[in-house]
Amino acid sequence: MIIDGHSYCLPQMDSKVGYPTLEHKMKLLQSELGGHIQPVWNVTDRKKADNSTLIDQHTGDLRDVEWTRVNGGLAWKIDGQTYTKQYVPPMLHNLECPPEVLIREMDYAEVDVGLLHTYPMIGTPKFLNDYLNKAVQKFPKRLYRLISITEGDLIRDVDKVIEMIDEQRRLGGVAGLQFIPGFYYQTLDDSSPDTWDSASLRPFWDAIYKMNLPVYFTLIGGRGSKIYERSWMDSYLAEQKVLLGWLNRYPGLNVVVTHGLPWTGYLENGQINFPEEIWDIFKSPNCHLQILIPIQMGARWEYPWKESEPIIKKAIERIGANRIIWGTDMPMVARFCTYKQALDQFRVHCDFLSDAERKDIIGGTAARVMGITN
């Protein structure tokens, strides 16, 4: 069985998706696009531009833009010019990836199962949980989903969040909870010493532990850090230390670190060199790692991403293939490669892998974590 451990169904990008107004949603999208590495260009002459057309590079403030579509793609107008970037791949002509599109891609690439992830930009938890539930109910045993929450709600009404999660998991097709610590910190005062593993959240995590619900942690750095600067890397390691303490408190509960490790942050002279402490969380036998090389390194390396093989080999040595999960970020990975190519990195290449290791990485590990037995 081949399982894509990290994929998406996407509602239309320029729709409200549960937010109070479309303007509210588009500001979230502007913030996301304005910090993203995908290139910007002027739609008139295709000359390169940059993210300063979205975000003031000195203050971090959002620019006053007018959103539009050009040739079916998202674009924005500012200072009399129209700009775009290919955040979603061109094939998503209506800025959406409904489950039918994902299933067709899976069928063609010979992927049996996809695990649908969440993110605030895709929709509010109420909207997104309903949207993804409909997808997995339409394609049972082909699609599974993670539960979306607003991490800040844990400060305001933890019991309500627990109740919602319990209701969602009873609907079926749920493989776990996605938790993004960085969004929890956004609701705290900068002077607060609390973390998402502080005593105030113990009732929440105790409830998740009692449910035996796997947790998919998306570590995006801590407070006030800028991605891939030294402050971000330091805060990433600090976040791992919080997770290590959490793992020790809740032994036996399956955990997955999504997106892999910060490959780009530790890229030096074409090689990824991690500090020793980055492996500490995997001392817990229940801590698993997703690996999504093409979506993260596709702007730098070409298929079959041979440059990544030394760090993949090291990850297998330090963690074990039985705790590594292949994922793609589909449909987003189509910015850089086909679905088959993303799979063939492990199905065909990485010659150092044994047959058993290949099977674990491209499906066996995910199946065990997700509780799939057939």
Features from the language model and the residues they span:
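Active-site mouth loops of central-metabolism enzymes
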Residues: K85-E96, L146-V158
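Short, well-structured secondary-structure segments
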Residues: P89-P90, E105, E110-G123, N133, ...
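Active-site metal-binding loops of divalent metal-dependent hydrolases
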Residues: S7-Y8, P120, G260, D329-M330
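Mid-to-C-terminal alpha-helical segments outside catalytic/metal-binding sites
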Residues: M1-G5, Q12-H93, C97-R104, Y108, ...
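Catalytic pocket-lining loop regions of alpha/beta-barrel enzymes
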Residues: P140, A175-G176, F183-Y185, D190-I325
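Histidine-centered divalent metal-coordination motifs
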Residues: H6-D14, T218, H259
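Short, acidic/polar
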Residues: E96-M106, N129, I155-Q168, F274
